[in-house]
C-alpha cells in the first residue's frame, strides 16, 4: 500500500461522518425556511477531510438590498432564528453567526445573490460559483486527490489563507488539483517552482504582483493565491521535492518532537488582549509588530537569529531569539573617506573621531538602548487594549508545542 493510500484511509470521511454533519445541517436549514439558504464550502464540494467538524451555510439575499443590509439587518434576523442555540458573532467583510451544535461548528453567512462571479458586492457572493466550478471539474477520485493535497499542506503547516497563517486556502488546493490533474502532479511541478509562478486556468483580467498567481476562474480579476506568503511557497516547494524523492506519512501527520536545548538568548513576549476581537484584525497587527520589532532590534545592535509568533485572538506569544542579550554601550561607527564630501559634518556630529589606516574616519557611538525589554515595549502597539508580560527563557514549557517548533527549527519532514 502506497503512502497516499494509507493517508486516504485516515482522511476520507465515511457514511457515518457524512450523516452526522448532514443531520446538523438539516437542523439549521429547517430554521431557515423562507430564506434562500444553501450548504456551501468543502462539505458541499465533497473535498472535506475526516475529522473536519464545520459546515458553511450561506443565506442569500437579493442583491438590491445592498451591503449595508448584510451588515445590519440580516444579522438581527439570523440571531432571532438561532437565539436559543450556542452562537457567537464573527466578522469578515460583514458579520455572520457561528453556531455550535453537537460539537459541529456551523457558519451561517449572509451574502448577496448575484448573476456571475464578476458581479460581486461582497467576497461571500462568489461562493456558489466557486462550488459550481469545483464540483463540475472534479470527480470522486479528484476529490480524494484534493484531500491528499489539503492534508499534506496541513502537515507541513502551510494550509489556511487567514492572515495568521498566510497559506493556501482550500479553494486554492482544489484549483491546483484541477490545474495539474492529481496530488502527485501538483508536487512534481511545485518542486521546481520559481516566483512569479503563473498558473492560468483562465486568462487573468489584470496584472498580479504576488509570487503565486492563480486567477479565479469565476472572477479573473482576482488572484486566488494572493494570501500565500513567499515563505509558505518555499516550504511547500521544498517539502514537495523531498516527498517526491522519499515519500513518508510524516509529511501528512508530523511527529511531535520536543526541543532539547535553548540556543542563544530568547525573550518570550506574552500579549493578552482585554476584549475579544476578530482574529484576522489581531494577526494583521501581530505581523506588523513582528516586522517593526525586527527592524528595531537590528538597529539597536542586537544579532537577531529568529523571531516567531503564535497564539489566537486572545493571547499571542512572540519569541525573539538573539545571539546574546548583553551588548556593549558603544559601537564602531564607520564614516567617509578623508577626501569625500561630508567629512566636516561627520566630525561635527561625532565626539570620539579618528582616522583609520584605510583613510576613513571612524567614531565611537553610544547605543540609544541596550535593554531589549525596553525596546520591545517602545515598539509594541495594538489598537486594542492589551497587557504585556516578558520573560527570558530559562527552561522549556513541555506543553507549548509551538515553542518547541520554534526552538527546534527543523521540521520533522525535512529529511536528509
UniProtKB/Swiss-Prot annotation:
<keyword id="KW-0460">Magnesium</keyword>
<feature type="binding site">
    <location>
        <position position="150"/>
    </location>
    <ligand>
        <name>CTP</name>
    </ligand>
</feature>
<dbReference type="InterPro" id="IPR002934">
    <property type="entry name" value="Polymerase_NTP_transf_dom"/>
</dbReference>
<feature type="binding site">
    <location>
        <position position="159"/>
    </location>
    <ligand>
        <name>CTP</name>
    </ligand>
</feature>
<feature type="binding site">
    <location>
        <position position="54"/>
    </location>
    <ligand>
        <name>Mg(2+)</name>
    </ligand>
</feature>
<dbReference type="Pfam" id="PF21133">
    <property type="entry name" value="CAA_C"/>
</dbReference>
<comment type="subunit">
    <text>Homodimer.</text>
</comment>
<feature type="binding site">
    <location>
        <position position="130"/>
    </location>
    <ligand>
        <name>CTP</name>
    </ligand>
</feature>
<dbReference type="InterPro" id="IPR008229">
    <property type="entry name" value="CCA-adding_arc"/>
</dbReference>
<feature type="binding site">
    <location>
        <position position="159"/>
    </location>
    <ligand>
        <name>ATP</name>
    </ligand>
</feature>
<comment type="similarity">
    <text>Belongs to the tRNA nucleotidyltransferase/poly(A) polymerase family. Archaeal CCA-adding enzyme subfamily.</text>
</comment>
<dbReference type="InterPro" id="IPR011068">
    <property type="entry name" value="NuclTrfase_I-like_C"/>
</dbReference>
<dbReference type="InterPro" id="IPR043519">
    <property type="entry name" value="NT_sf"/>
</dbReference>
<feature type="binding site">
    <location>
        <position position="42"/>
    </location>
    <ligand>
        <name>ATP</name>
    </ligand>
</feature>
<feature type="binding site">
    <location>
        <position position="130"/>
    </location>
    <ligand>
        <name>ATP</name>
    </ligand>
</feature>
<keyword id="KW-0479">Metal-binding</keyword>
<keyword id="KW-0548">Nucleotidyltransferase</keyword>
<comment type="function">
    <text>Catalyzes the addition and repair of the essential 3'-terminal CCA sequence in tRNAs without using a nucleic acid template. Adds these three nucleotides in the order of C, C, and A to the tRNA nucleotide-73, using CTP and ATP as substrates and producing inorganic pyrophosphate. tRNA 3'-terminal CCA addition is required both for tRNA processing and repair. Also involved in tRNA surveillance by mediating tandem CCA addition to generate a CCACCA at the 3' terminus of unstable tRNAs. While stable tRNAs receive only 3'-terminal CCA, unstable tRNAs are marked with CCACCA and rapidly degraded.</text>
</comment>
<keyword id="KW-0819">tRNA processing</keyword>
<feature type="binding site">
    <location>
        <position position="56"/>
    </location>
    <ligand>
        <name>Mg(2+)</name>
    </ligand>
</feature>
<feature type="binding site">
    <location>
        <position position="107"/>
    </location>
    <ligand>
        <name>Mg(2+)</name>
    </ligand>
</feature>
<keyword id="KW-0067">ATP-binding</keyword>
<dbReference type="GO" id="GO:0004810">
    <property type="term" value="F:CCA tRNA nucleotidyltransferase activity"/>
</dbReference>
<dbReference type="InterPro" id="IPR048833">
    <property type="entry name" value="CAA_C"/>
</dbReference>
<dbReference type="Pfam" id="PF01909">
    <property type="entry name" value="NTP_transf_2"/>
</dbReference>
<dbReference type="GO" id="GO:0042245">
    <property type="term" value="P:RNA repair"/>
</dbReference>
<keyword id="KW-0808">Transferase</keyword>
<feature type="binding site">
    <location>
        <position position="150"/>
    </location>
    <ligand>
        <name>ATP</name>
    </ligand>
</feature>
<dbReference type="InterPro" id="IPR042090">
    <property type="entry name" value="CCA_tRNA_nucleotrans_2"/>
</dbReference>
<dbReference type="GO" id="GO:0001680">
    <property type="term" value="P:tRNA 3'-terminal CCA addition"/>
</dbReference>
<feature type="binding site">
    <location>
        <position position="45"/>
    </location>
    <ligand>
        <name>ATP</name>
    </ligand>
</feature>
<dbReference type="InterPro" id="IPR006116">
    <property type="entry name" value="NT_2-5OAS_ClassI-CCAase"/>
</dbReference>
<keyword id="KW-0692">RNA repair</keyword>
<keyword id="KW-0694">RNA-binding</keyword>
<dbReference type="GO" id="GO:0000049">
    <property type="term" value="F:tRNA binding"/>
</dbReference>
<dbReference type="GO" id="GO:0000287">
    <property type="term" value="F:magnesium ion binding"/>
</dbReference>
<dbReference type="GO" id="GO:0005524">
    <property type="term" value="F:ATP binding"/>
</dbReference>
<dbReference type="InterPro" id="IPR015329">
    <property type="entry name" value="tRNA_NucTransf2"/>
</dbReference>
<dbReference type="Pfam" id="PF09249">
    <property type="entry name" value="tRNA_NucTransf2"/>
</dbReference>
<feature type="binding site">
    <location>
        <position position="42"/>
    </location>
    <ligand>
        <name>CTP</name>
    </ligand>
</feature>
<protein>
    <recommendedName>
        <fullName>CCA-adding enzyme</fullName>
        <ecNumber>2.7.7.72</ecNumber>
    </recommendedName>
</protein>
<keyword id="KW-0547">Nucleotide-binding</keyword>
Amino acid at each position: 500500500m502506497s503512502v497516499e493510500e494509507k493517508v486516504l484511509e485516515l482522511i476520507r470521511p465515511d457514511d457515518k461522518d457524512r450523516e452526522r454533519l448532514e443531520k446538523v445541517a438539516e437542523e439549521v436549514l429547517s430554521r431557515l425556511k423562507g430564506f434562500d439558504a444553501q450548504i456551501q464550502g468543502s462539505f458541499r464540494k465533497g473535498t472535506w477531510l475526516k475529522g473536519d467538524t464545520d459546515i458553511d451555510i450561506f443565506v442569500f439575499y437579493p442583491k438590491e438590498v445592498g451591503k449595508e443590509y448584510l451588515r445590519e439587518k440580516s444579522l438581527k434576523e439570523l440571531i432571532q432564528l438561532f437565539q436559543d442555540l450556542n452562537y457567537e458573532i464573527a466578522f469578515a467583510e460583514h458579520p455572520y453567526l457561528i453556531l455550535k451544535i453537537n460539537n459541529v461548528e456551523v457558519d451561517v453567512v449572509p451574502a448577496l445573490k448575484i448573476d456571475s462571479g464578476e458581479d460581486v458586492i461582497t467576497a461571500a457572493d462568489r461562493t456558489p460559483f466557486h462550488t459550481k466550478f469545483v464540483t463540475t471539474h472534479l470527480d470522486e477520485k479528484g476529490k480524494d486527490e484534493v484531500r491528499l493535497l489539503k492534508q499534506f499542506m496541513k502537515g507541513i503547516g502551510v494550509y489556511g489563507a487567514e492572515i495568521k497563517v498566510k497559506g493556501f486556502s482550500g479553494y486554492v488546493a482544489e484549483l491546483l488539483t484541477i490545474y495539474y490533474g492529481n496530488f502527485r502532479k501538483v508536487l512534481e511541478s511545485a518542486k521546481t517552482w520559481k516566483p512569479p509562478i503563473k498558473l492560468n486556468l483562465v486568462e487573468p483580467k489584470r496584472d498580479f504582483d504576488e509570487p503565486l498567481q492563480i486567477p479565479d476562474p469565476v472572477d479573473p480579476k482576482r488572484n486566488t493565491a494572493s494570501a500565500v506568503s513567499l515563505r509558505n511557497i518555499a516550504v511547500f516547494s521544498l517539502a514537495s521535492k523531498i516527498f517526491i524523492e522519499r515519500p513518508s506519512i510524516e509529511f501528512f501527520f508530523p511527529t511531535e518532537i520536543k526541543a532539547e536545548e535553548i540556543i542563544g538568548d530568547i525573550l518570550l513576549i506574552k500579549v493578552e488582549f482585554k476584549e475579544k476581537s476578530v482574529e484576522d484584525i489581531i494577526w494583521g497587527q501581530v505581523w506588523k509588530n513582528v516586522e517593526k520589532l525586527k527592524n528595531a532590534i537590528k538597529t539597536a545592535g542586537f544579532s537577531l537569529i529568529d523571531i516567531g509568533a503564535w497564539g489566537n485572538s486572545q493571547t499571542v506569544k512572540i519569541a525573539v531569539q538573539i545571539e546574546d542579550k548583553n551588548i556593549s554601550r558603544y559601537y564602531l561607527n564607520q564614516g567617509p573617506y578623508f577626501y569625500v564630501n561630508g567629512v566636516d559634518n561627520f566630525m561635527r556630529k561625532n565626539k570620539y573621531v579618528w582616522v583609520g589606516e584605510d583613510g576613513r574616519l571612524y567614531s565611537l557611538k553610544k547605543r540609544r538602548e541596550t535593554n531589549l525589554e525596553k525596546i520591545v515595549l517602545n515598539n509594541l502597539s495594538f489598537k486594542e487594549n492589551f497587557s504585556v508580560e516578558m520573560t527570558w527563557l530559562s527552561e522549556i514549557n513541555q506543553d507549548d508545542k509551538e515553542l518547541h517548533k520554534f526552538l527546534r527549527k527543523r521540521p520533522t519532514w525535512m529529511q536528509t
